[in-house]
Amino acid sequence: MIQVRHASVSDRDTIVEFQVRLAKESEGLELDRAKVTQGVQAVFDRPHSGRYWVAQSGDKVVACLLTIPEWSDWRNGTVLWIHSLYVLPECRRRDVFR
Protein backbone atom coordinates (compact mmCIF):
# COMPACT_ATOMS: atom_id res chain seq x y z
CA MET A 1 0.00 0.00 0.00
CA ILE A 2 1.23 3.48 -0.87
CA GLN A 3 1.27 6.13 1.83
CA VAL A 4 1.86 9.81 1.10
CA ARG A 5 3.41 12.15 3.65
CA HIS A 6 5.19 15.46 3.93
CA ALA A 7 8.88 14.94 3.28
CA SER A 8 11.33 15.59 6.07
CA VAL A 9 14.97 16.59 5.96
CA SER A 10 15.83 12.91 6.37
CA ASP A 11 14.36 12.37 2.87
CA ARG A 12 16.66 14.98 1.33
CA ASP A 13 19.20 12.62 -0.22
CA THR A 14 16.46 10.49 -1.77
CA ILE A 15 14.79 13.58 -3.22
CA VAL A 16 18.14 14.75 -4.61
CA GLU A 17 18.70 11.35 -6.22
CA PHE A 18 15.22 11.43 -7.75
CA GLN A 19 15.77 14.93 -9.16
CA VAL A 20 19.09 13.92 -10.71
CA ARG A 21 17.36 10.91 -12.30
CA LEU A 22 14.43 13.05 -13.47
CA ALA A 23 16.70 15.46 -15.33
CA LYS A 24 18.60 12.59 -16.94
CA GLU A 25 15.49 10.65 -17.98
CA SER A 26 13.37 13.57 -19.17
CA GLU A 27 15.94 15.94 -20.68
CA GLY A 28 19.22 14.03 -20.91
CA LEU A 29 20.82 16.47 -18.45
CA GLU A 30 23.55 15.66 -15.96
CA LEU A 31 22.87 17.87 -12.96
CA ASP A 32 25.44 19.02 -10.42
CA ARG A 33 24.46 16.94 -7.38
CA ALA A 34 25.89 19.51 -4.94
CA LYS A 35 23.77 22.26 -6.48
CA VAL A 36 20.65 20.08 -6.44
CA THR A 37 21.34 19.24 -2.78
CA GLN A 38 21.52 22.95 -1.99
CA GLY A 39 18.30 23.56 -3.91
CA VAL A 40 16.40 20.81 -2.13
CA GLN A 41 17.75 21.93 1.25
CA ALA A 42 16.60 25.48 0.48
CA VAL A 43 12.99 24.28 0.36
CA PHE A 44 13.35 22.70 3.80
CA ASP A 45 15.02 25.87 5.10
CA ARG A 46 12.29 28.11 3.62
CA PRO A 47 9.00 26.24 4.01
CA HIS A 48 7.00 29.17 2.58
CA SER A 49 8.70 28.57 -0.79
CA GLY A 50 7.33 25.06 -1.27
CA ARG A 51 6.82 21.65 0.24
CA TYR A 52 8.10 18.24 -0.76
CA TRP A 53 5.87 15.20 -0.53
CA VAL A 54 6.96 11.58 -0.71
CA ALA A 55 5.12 8.36 -1.44
CA GLN A 56 6.21 5.28 0.47
CA SER A 57 5.66 1.61 -0.14
CA GLY A 58 6.53 -0.07 3.12
CA ASP A 59 9.75 1.57 4.32
CA LYS A 60 10.87 2.61 0.84
CA VAL A 61 10.31 6.06 -0.69
CA VAL A 62 9.16 5.38 -4.25
CA ALA A 63 8.15 8.86 -5.44
CA CYS A 64 8.32 12.54 -4.65
CA LEU A 65 6.94 15.85 -5.80
CA LEU A 66 7.24 19.50 -4.87
CA THR A 67 4.26 21.81 -4.43
CA ILE A 68 4.88 25.51 -4.89
CA PRO A 69 2.31 28.12 -3.82
CA GLU A 70 1.48 31.03 -6.09
CA TRP A 71 -0.96 33.88 -5.52
CA SER A 72 -3.71 34.01 -8.13
CA ASP A 73 -5.46 37.32 -8.64
CA TRP A 74 -7.95 35.51 -10.88
CA ARG A 75 -8.99 33.32 -7.98
CA ASN A 76 -8.18 35.74 -5.15
CA GLY A 77 -6.36 32.91 -3.48
CA THR A 78 -3.34 30.69 -3.51
CA VAL A 79 -2.94 27.89 -6.03
CA LEU A 80 -0.44 25.06 -5.77
CA TRP A 81 1.75 24.04 -8.68
CA ILE A 82 3.21 20.54 -8.88
CA HIS A 83 6.89 20.40 -9.78
CA SER A 84 9.72 17.90 -9.68
CA LEU A 85 7.51 14.81 -9.82
CA TYR A 86 9.45 11.55 -9.95
CA VAL A 87 8.34 7.94 -9.53
CA LEU A 88 10.83 5.07 -9.49
CA PRO A 89 10.64 3.18 -12.81
CA GLU A 90 9.62 -0.09 -11.17
CA CYS A 91 6.67 1.67 -9.49
CA ARG A 92 5.29 3.48 -12.53
CA ARG A 93 1.83 2.61 -13.81
CA ARG A 94 0.92 1.31 -10.37
CA ASP A 95 -1.25 4.24 -9.26
CA VAL A 96 1.47 5.89 -7.17
CA PHE A 97 0.59 9.30 -8.62
CA ARG A 98 -3.15 9.23 -8.72
What are these regions (language model features)?
Residues 2, 6-77, 83, 88:
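Acetyl-CoA-dependent GNAT
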